[in-house]
Amino acid sequence: MTTGKPQSFEKMRTPFPGRSKAKGPQSDIIPSAPPNTPVTEH
């Protein structure tokens, strides 16, 4: 399971495997950006 590092990383950072794969990394960053990083505060 050492070669599956990229796969496990994608599954961890992407709560929606079907949506993140269809839209891409942006769909994962959009919902994870506001709650994780204070964009409105900056």
Curated annotation (Swiss-Prot):
Residues 1-42 are annotated as: Disordered. Residues 32-42 have a biased composition (Pro residues). This is Uncharacterized protein SPAPB1A11.06. It comes from Schizosaccharomyces pombe (strain 972 / ATCC 24843).
